[in-house]
Amino acid sequence: MNTAPASWVFQWPLHAGDFRDPNYYLRLSYAVDASWTVGTSLSRGPYDRQDAAGIPAGKDTGDFPQTLAGVDVQYAIGAVEVFAEAYWTQIQAPLVDNLELWSWYVEAKYKILPGLFGAVRLAQMIFGSIDDASGVSHQWDRNLTRVEFGGGYFFTRNFFTKATVQLNYTMGGREPHDNLFVWQVGLGF
């Protein structure tokens, strides 16, 4: 990979020097049986060059990598599918302590009728602490709990519509009221 896993897809085009400090990615998974699959992922690489503006003189993006490690589980039986993932990430920042973050989710999907499904997801992002200039420790962002529920319909194998409601709860401080309703029509090929 030529950029960190937390970067936007629009930052992925190749440029001269992109592989000077590459991002390494490892993924292992094992199908326990027809119903269970377990996996793990590991990634380590530098910030994207667009983040280099605040890096001290004599350093470059390769001196401040992001490390990501996670596990995932998938289970399916009959009309029910369950997915779960948990990830830890650490971003080595040039001007503050290392930034750590834990995130996880559990999702269940139920096939109500052929083509018709419903789903629910619970997720959290738990931010680590950094020391301010006076040495006092603070969380570097507010923890987030997210609940999603929705459903959809597959008209064909590759043509579908779905709707989702996402409720976001930020812990501590002002609640930004950033809940979402999303309706999507998709066509895969």
Name these PLM-found stretches:
Residues 1-45:
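Aromatic- and glycine-enriched pocket-lining scaffold segments that form the walls
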Residues 32, 36-189:
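Outer-membrane beta-barrel pore domains
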